[in-house]
Amino acid sequence: MTEKWIDAVALYEIPEGDVLGVTVEGKELALYEVEGEIYATDNLCTHGAARMSDGFLEGREIECPLHQGRFDVCTGRALCAPVTQNIKTYPVKIEGQRVMIDLS
């Protein structure tokens, strides 16, 4: 599969240790800053229709604001009930001060 890097946001727009919701080419994503690294997942919880960008980020775990299920934002792994399905992650790279995401 060919990579297709898309300019999502400026790096400074993602608060340190927090999450930012963005729409990239019509797709809702959540971008996370964890210990100096940026990670990207789908913005909707796999359990309910809650936006992950409205959740609480602690370390590398995001807590869904609706039912308090948690995901590892680095791997997408579902960590506790009621979530059982992993959340999709996307490759991220930084070019200059821009956050680039591969949606392919």
UniProtKB/Swiss-Prot annotation:
Pathway: Aromatic compound metabolism; naphthalene degradation. Keywords: 2Fe-2S, Aromatic hydrocarbons catabolism, Electron transport, Iron, Iron-sulfur, Metal-binding, Transport. One of its GO terms (molecular function) is metal ion binding. Its cofactor is [2Fe-2S] cluster. One of its GO terms (biological process) is catabolic process. Binds 1 [2Fe-2S] cluster per subunit. [2Fe-2S] cluster binds at residues 45, 47, 64, 67. Component of the naphthalene dioxygenase (NDO) multicomponent enzyme system which catalyzes the incorporation of both atoms of molecular oxygen into naphthalene to form cis-(1R,2S)-dihydroxy-1,2-dihydronaphthalene. Functions as an intermediate electron transfer protein via a specific interaction with iron sulfur protein components (ISP) (NdoB and NdoC). The naphthalene dioxygenase (NDO) multicomponent enzyme system is composed of an electron transfer component and a dioxygenase component (iron sulfur protein (ISP)). The electron transfer component is composed of a ferredoxin reductase (NdoR) and a ferredoxin (NdoA), and the dioxygenase component is formed of a heterohexamer (trimer of heterodimers) of three large alpha subunits (NdoB) and three small beta subunits (NdoC). PANTHER family: 3-PHENYLPROPIONATE_CINNAMIC ACID DIOXYGENASE FERREDOXIN SUBUNIT (PTHR21496:SF23), FERREDOXIN-RELATED (PTHR21496). Belongs to the bacterial ring-hydroxylating dioxygenase ferredoxin component family. This is Naphthalene 1,2-dioxygenase system, ferredoxin component. It comes from Pseudomonas aeruginosa.
